Amino acid sequence: IITEVSGVTRHSAILARAMGIPAVLSVKGVTDSVCDGEMLIADGFKGKVITDPSEAELKKYRKKNDEYQKEKESLSEYFGKPTVTKSGVLKKVYGNIAKAEDAQNVVQNGGEGIGLFRTEFLFMDRDHAPTEDEQFEAYSTVAKALDGKEVIIRTLDIGGDKAVEYLNIDKEENPFLGFRAIRYCLKNTELFKTQLRAILRAAQFGNIKIMLPLVTCVDEIKQAKALIAECISELESEGKRYRDVPVGIMVETPSAAIISDLLAEEAAFFSIGTNDLTGYTMAVDRGNANVSNLYDPTQPVSYTHL
């Protein structure tokens, strides 16, 4: 995949990486300078595109690809083994998924849980929102595949660089600072409750947790938990099986990092979203190649937030 726009943390890049597709993004003028059927080399490691490669370049990159595939195969020896740091601390390695069918890949590759189920992708590439039963099927499929291992489901994280036309979100000058993620869900409670009900119902099949995106204040957690309580009451009155689940948040804004002690009183767990946290802290549009040099998670302020 080669695109003219999109930075290294855009979701197109995230999905390409997850699917093992070589990708080079933000290549200015590529659509004008490349013709259909033209031979290209996309070097996703160096972020380089070679047009009309010579035989020597083709030979070089075929060799590189063979070496890369062998390196991937060599990692199989670590399958099923515990993950331990040099200092002897035991860790768990989780996988992130965008579709229910991705869960099996996590299991097959030795993943010890799902750290992030990006549920927004269930809402994309369609002309209406998924029903409660459709979402229930997706979430329960993942829970069953993980067989008791932890599954963290992030509620609808829409807006910003993830547009869904049928949700009718107004075009904004600064979409990353606007009506998105938990802000959208708390204003569209029926859509939100449909998702929450599906998650609660699916929780009976595994170790599911709910994670709220882009939280900036304590009240957002309280409002979400109140809606979850409403959903539980409804499911009980309808005689539908469910399981209550822990509710955590993504810490991906400077405000959440600064008041993390207060948020911890309401949230069962934190997940640090370094992509957005870095972007908001450094005041950098993560999809703008002109300022991408400022997008650096190793800046001292990033460690201050952590």
Briefly describe each language-model feature range.
Residues 73-306:
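Conserved alpha/beta-domain cores
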Residues 1-111:
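Acidic, glycine-rich flexible loop/linker segments
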